[in-house]
């Protein structure tokens, strides 16, 4: 699916068919992201924040918010938030550090950006919307020239045994980062660590589209699985090194020829 660079509008990052991705510039636009997150997380993850119809936290103010819009209706159908290492240093830190103690961060902080709160309207989970979320990140990476992308990727909270099996499989097969090492903070420990099958198999249940996309792009798992009880998810810390990305996926990710 072809994603085109925009011709106009400074905050417009890319276009694909009748969808576009842009950077939120106003509090009202950020509310659109928070409303979508509330609706999707509340409906699918049974995570219901306070009753104002918004999913918001203390980190939202320091993040930049990507919005995918369906142009015919004007509806916001996808969102992702992203912050630089400098943003994190000036604010409350990295969101991922609320779940993990992460060794190695300071060595790469200046080259590191963090993403999170990926969310797509269930009626619009097409290739176009997902491609535009990737294109938005790629446009920022090209502009800001950061090397590393870090974030938490979620799978259903019932898959604790499968999460540990997945982590063990990647560790045996070179899929775990040697740059960062995340360990669960108190209250985020993932159970079932010891009750693992002996087979060296990759459990397909954990391979959500987002996680699969990161792994295909060359990302590595940067920490053991954690259990986010508030959201009812198991989370993996991922680290994507743009400097180590293959030419094929660099072209796919950035749109470069």
Predicted feature locations:
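C-terminal "cap" of GNAT-fold acetyltransferases
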Residues: 232-245
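Short, cationic low-complexity segments
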Residues: 256-257
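Acyl-donor binding region in acyl/amide transferases
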Residues: 85-220, 225-233
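Long, contiguous binding/interaction regions
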Residues: 246-253
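Short amphipathic alpha-helix that is part of the acyltransferase structural core
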Residues: 9-77, 81-84
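Acyl-donor-binding surface of acyltransferase catalytic domains
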Residues: 1-6, 49
